[in-house]
């Protein structure tokens, strides 16, 4: 069982119609990691945090911000397709430290990272699109579908209770397509 928490990056006015404040994605991820840091599922060694991002630049920015927190006994590890095989394999080797893994949607379905108890979902991904007009393949950043959000949530809670923080609102989630086109 996984508890899903919504922590949108925009704060609305009390009437829900006006954006009062907006945080950037890295700040939202840092806040979510700090929130999850104090929580450990009862009787579990699944204490690692898996954060989903749309690309390498976002991962590097978040890695810098999370490393600056200097959380004790923690290592921050990137995971994306262009990493060398040796760097990717670091994610699958448990160390004595708690890990924060920053990944693209490569970690959504194709592999299982051991020790994940928590997920932070930014709600975006690079989605492959082919333009019939220009005959060019593109990778724009788009909101993920409900099915992709469910896949991301399912990365935790496999061996014990888990928590997924989504950096978007319930209303945003409900408005998303069921599946990626």
Spans of model-derived segments:
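P-loop NTPase motor module signature
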Residues: 1-181
């Amino acid at each position: 069982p996984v508890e899903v928490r919504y922590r949108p990056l925009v704060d609305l006015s009390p009437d829900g119609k006006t954006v009062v404040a907006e945080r950037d994605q890295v700040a939202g991820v840092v806040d979510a990691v700090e929130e999850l840091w104090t929580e450990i599922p009862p009787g579990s060694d699944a204490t690692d945090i898996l954060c989903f991002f749309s690309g390498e630049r976002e991962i590097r920015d978040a890695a810098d911000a999370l490393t600056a927190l200097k959380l004790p006994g923690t290592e921050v590890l990137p995971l994306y397709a262009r990493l060398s095989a040796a760097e990717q394999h670091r994610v699958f080797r448990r160390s004595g430290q708690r890990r924060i893994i920053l990944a693209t949607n490569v970690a959504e379905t194709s592999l299982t990272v051991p020790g994940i108890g928590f997920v932070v979902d930014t709600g975006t991904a690079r989605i492959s699109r082919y333009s019939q007009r220009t005959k060019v393949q593109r990778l724009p950043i788009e909101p993920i579908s409900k099915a992709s959000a469910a896949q991301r949530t399912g990365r935790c809670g496999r061996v014990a209770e888990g928590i997924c923080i989504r950096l978007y609102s319930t209303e945003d989630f409900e408005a998303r397509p069921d599946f990626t086109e």
